[in-house]
Amino acid sequence: MQIFNMVSLVALFALGATAVPVSSITGVQCCQANHGDLTTPQAQSLFKSHQKRQDYWVCHACNKQFTTPAALQKHKDTVVHP
């Protein structure tokens, strides 16, 4: 398994690579599995969905997710948890 940074991913797509690196939550890592059956548009779609991934904050009392820390704080200030 090799670790790629985002520059390497961009370079792969610029060269028209059809193998798609599989990312993990802790970092971007490359899976050595054969992804030769993926077309270039499919690979680009997977790459774009990776870019759209957002961080979120969770209220541990009610398990709700928020897109900003400010929204989480507002929730904690306004909602009474049992």
Swiss-Prot record:
Signal peptide: 1-19
Zinc finger region(s), C2H2-type: 57-81
Domain of life, source organism: Eukaryota
Keywords attached to this entry: Host nucleus, Metal-binding, Secreted, Signal, Transcription, Transcription regulation, Virulence, Zinc, Zinc-finger
Location of this chain's protein in the cell: Secreted; Host nucleus
GO MF term set: zinc ion binding
Gene Ontology CC annotations of this record: extracellular region; host cell nucleus
Main location: secreted
Reported function: Probable secreted effector that translocates into the nuclei of host cells to reprogram the expression of targeted genes by binding on effector binding elements in rice.
Protein name: Host transcription reprogramming factor 10
Gene giving rise to this polypeptide: HTR10
